[in-house]
Amino acid sequence: MIQQKKALEIFQKRVFLESIIDETISFNKKLSWNSDNKNLTLTKTAEELVEVFKLRSDVFTEIGYQDEFPDTIEGLNFDVYDKTSAVIYYKNNKEVSATIRLIFDSENRLPSEKKESFDDMRAKYNCIGEISRNIVKTRGQGLNLEFKYLMCGIYNVFINNDIDIALSGIRKEHLKLFKKLGGVEIYKELNSYGSLETPCLIISYNPNYASNFFKKVFLEE
C-alpha cells in the first residue's frame, strides 16, 4: 500500500512537471525578446527548462536554501509560477550557468505574497510581477558577469512586454547593489524571509527608470 502511494505520488509529480514544461514553453514563446547576446535567451524547449530546473536545485542545495525553496522532484526545482514566467538563462561554454525568472501576475498571485499582499500595487498598476530564482552557478564577490547578463534579460522582458513593475525579495545587504540599477525602491522590510533567518527586503523595480550606471555598465550604451 505504501509503495502504491509512493508510485502514485511520483506519477503525479511527473504529470505536473510535464504540464509546467508545456505551459512555460508556450508562455515564453508568446513574449517579445530582443537581444544580440546569443548566450542569453528565454527557455523555449523542454531540454532548456530541465537544465534550468537542475541548476536551481544544485545551487539551492549548495547554499542551503532547500528548506525555503524545496525541489518538487529530487534534483529539479520548479513550481506553478513557472507557467506564467519569463524564464531567462545564460550559457557559458554551452552550459547553463545562470538563470532568473520574471513572474507575470495571474490567478496564482505571486510567491512573496505568502509573506505580504501586493494588492495595493495591483490597484496602482495594470500588470505587476515578481523577480525570483536569481541563480548563478559560480558566485564570486562583487558584480559578476552572469548577474549583469540576467538583469539585462529582465530589462529586455520589461521593455518589450506589457508589465509595469516587479517586486522581489532580497537580502538587506544586497540593497546597495540593486539601488545602483535605478528604479529600485524599498517596498517592505522583513526580519526574515520564511525559513531564511536573515534581514530581508521586498523591493519594487521599474527598469524604465534605469540609472546611467545600469545603461553604461549593463546595457553598454
Regions found by a protein language model. Name each.
Residues 113-207:
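Acyl-donor binding region in acyl/amide transferases
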Residues 204-221:
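C-terminal helix-cap and adjacent tail motif
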Residues 72-79, 190-193:
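Short, solvent-exposed loop/turn elements at beta->coil junctions and helix N-caps
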Residues 77-88, 98, 109-110:
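A short helix-loop-beta-strand connector motif used in the catalytic cores of GNAT acetyltransferases and
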Residues 1-35:
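Short acidic N-proximal helix/loop "leader" segments that mark the beginning
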Residues 90-93, 205:
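Active-site beta-strand termini and strand-to-loop segments that position acidic
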Residues 92-121:
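Short, His- and charge-rich active-site/binding loops that engage polyanionic ligands
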Residues 27-76, 87-89, 96:
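Short amphipathic alpha-helix that is part of the acyltransferase structural core
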